Design a protein with these regions (language model features):
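General small-molecule cofactor/ligand-binding pocket signal
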Residues: 26, 103-105, 196-199
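Class I SAM-dependent transferase core
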Residues: 7-48
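Conserved Class I SAM-dependent methyltransferase catalytic core
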Residues: 152-209
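Mobile active-site "lid"/loop adjacent to the S-adenosyl-L-methionine
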Residues: 128-157
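Residue-level signal for inorganic ion chemistry
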Residues: 41, 127, 158, 216
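Conserved SAM/SAH cofactor-binding pocket of Class I
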Residues: 44-137
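Short, structurally constrained coil/turn elements
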Residues: 19, 98, 189-192
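SAM/dcSAM-binding transferase cores
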Residues: 208-249
């Protein structure tokens, strides 16, 4: 298939340069475009050489596509419930000629074991909906509401399926809101995933954290490393040097 046939401009789609090893992503601004949280997550994730990684709630496929160059994973699977978003992700994979390395599954993450064997995954990562179904005002646009609110999945379901997919000593990575950290830790432990590493993300170094990166290890003992905080901006609309480095600039 010709590359220009993969982008449906008549439907509002565009091709975005990820400025990372010549990678591109097909997106539709009328649906949901990736944010800095996906970029930070992909930079935080670790996959062993020739390992198998699964990205839950993959959306546009941004995390698998970035992991294809940021890690030495042999195989990466993204799972996305919204069919039109999953289709865009699949076409982005094809545009970047990554079909042999990345596959996109269009289904509910609760059905992951229909496609992936139990306890066979080295790394599971996820940038899930942050807000509970009844929390905050839902976006009237359904694709955006699904991406932001726990309408079709929830925190417990995400961590439960991660446990089922992971090998013993497999790694789990998540980005979420600090306000839900106690819930996250409780659910991880209930599912035998011990929190191992966290890093708080701040808009500015002197502001409250608004995101947190979390790493867990399945079946591990108890210890936790809190990394130095990451500030996104040094002044209004100006990224810090570390964030610029993450973006490859």
């Amino acid at each position: 298939m010709m590359k220009d046939k993969l982008i449906r401009e008549e439907c509002g789609e565009r091709l975005d340069d990820l400025q990372c090893d010549g990678l591109y992503l097909i997106q539709n601004p009328d649906k949901f475009c990736f944010g800095i949280d996906a970029v930070l997550l992909s930079n935080f994730v670790k996959v062993k050489k020739d390992g198998y990684a699964v990205d839950l709630c993959t959306g546009s496929g941004i995390v698998p596509i970035l992991l294809s160059t940021k890690t030495k994973a042999k195989k990466i699977t993204g799972i996305e419930i919204q069919s039109d978003i999953a289709d865009m992700a699949s076409r982005s994979v094809s545009y970047n000629k990554l079909d042999e390395k990345i596959d996109i599954i269009n289904d509910d993450i609760s059905n992951a074991l229909k496609y992936i064997k139990h306890s066979c995954v080295d790394t599971v990562c996820v940038n899930p909906p942050y807000m509970k179904d009844m929390a905050a005002i839902k976006n009237p646009d359904l694709p955006l509401a699904i991406a932001r609110h726990e309408l079709l999945t929830d925190l417990e379901s995400v961590i439960n399926i991660a446990n089922k997919l992971l090998k013993e000593n497999g790694r789990f990575f998540m980005i979420h809101r600090p306000s839900r950290l106690s819930e996250i830790f409780a659910s991880m432990r209930q599912n035998r995933i011990e929190p191992k590493r966290i890093r708080f993300i701040h808009s500015y170094i002197d502001s409250k954290a608004n995101l947190v990166l979390i790493e867990g290890l399945k079946g591990s003992g108890v210890w936790l490393d809190v990394e130095p905080p990451l500030a996104v901006y040094k002044e209004k609309n100006v990224y810090t040097d570390e964030v610029l480095k993450i973006y490859g600039r």
